[in-house]
Design a protein with these regions (language model features):
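C-terminal substrate-recognition "lid" of short-chain dehydrogenase/reductases
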Residues: 128-131, 187, 221-250, 255
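Conserved glycine-rich Rossmann-like NAD(P)H-binding loop of the short-chain dehydrogenase/reductase
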Residues: 38-54
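Active-site helix of classical SDR
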Residues: 131, 167, 175
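Alpha-helical segment proximal to the catalytic Tyr-Lys
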Residues: 136, 180-184, 241
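Substrate-binding pocket helix/loop in short-chain dehydrogenase/reductase
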Residues: 107-108, 112-120, 213
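Residue(s) in the substrate-gating loop at a strand-loop-helix junction
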Residues: 151
Length: 256
């Protein structure tokens, strides 16, 4: 009984302010829901204002505190504006979840410049821009949690995903470096590396390919968005106060 109470308190985010990018759907929405349910005030960021509005409305319908901020994560000026607006509204920033990301899959010899650039810009540059903007208010508050979305593809590589794998490998390197830079200010920086998760992105692979994928996963199934959200909650919470520079795989044993 006591152990359960301690665990609940450790992941209680009441009074904490969080930014989640790519929050309008998929993993980002699941993460926003999890943080809200744990007591955080969540600033939902996404390039799609329409989908963002639907997500924020759904969060508020549960009695949670959420605001929507339309933003292209590759636009440095807009990123800075969003962070400033969040800090002004809620008095600080405690948690940043860099989840926004895209794929433009094709074999490397067929990959066009714009396919490479778009993935690197959103997945890696967007992560950097939000870290840079969020670091200042976190340093001022002498506390922070930064969680970046990596991927097992950034650890092992994946045919047809040279751009995506490179961007996620870059996120891992960025995570470890910034973890060292900000540790002295009590700011932890970690990454979550999902494997195959049941989202719109994986559904597009088709049933036949997904059945083959499941055979490669020791647990024999795809992960759920909630599995990733739980990992993010842990890293955002006091339960992970001594964890930094770490990459937490959520892949059902795929990379074991």
């Amino acid at each position: 009984m006591t152990e359960g109470l301690v665990n609940t308190l450790a992941t209680n985010l009441s009074g904490r302010v969080a930014i989640v990018t790519g929050a309008a759907r998929g993993l980002g929405r699941a993460i926003a829901e999890k943080l809200c349910a744990s007591g955080a005030q969540v600033a939902c960021v996404d390039v799609s204002a329409e989908l963002l509005g639907e997500t924020v409305a759904a969060l508020r319908a549960n009695g949670w505190t959420a605001e929507g901020y339309p933003c292209d994560v590759t636009n440095s000026q807009r990123v800075n504006e969003v962070v400033d607006e969040v800090v002004k509204k809620w008095g600080g920033l405690d948690i940043l979840v860099n989840n926004a990301g895209i794929t433009r899959d094709t074999m490397v010899m067929r990959m066009k410049d714009d396919q490479w650039d778009a993935v690197l810009d959103i997945n890696l540059k967007g992560t950097f821009l939000f870290i840079r903007a969020a670091a200042r208010p976190m340093m001022k508050g002498r506390r922070g949690r930064i969680i970046n979305m990596a991927s097992v593809s950034g650890m092992t590589g994946n045919p047809g995903q040279a751009n995506y794998s490179a961007s996620k490998a870059g996120v891992i390197g960025l995570t470890r470096t910034v973890a060292r830079e900000l540790a002295g200010r009590n700011i932890t920086v970690n990454a979550v590396a999902p494997g195959f998760i049941a989202t719109e992105m994986t559904a597009a692979l088709g049933e036949q390919i997904l059945e083959e994928v499941k055979k490669r996963i020791p647990l024999g199934r795809l992960g759920e968005p909630g599995d990733v959200a739980n990992a993010v909650l842990f890293l955002a919470s006091d339960a992970a106060s001594f964890v930094t520079g770490h990459v937490l795989t959520v892949d059902g044993g795929l990379t074991a």
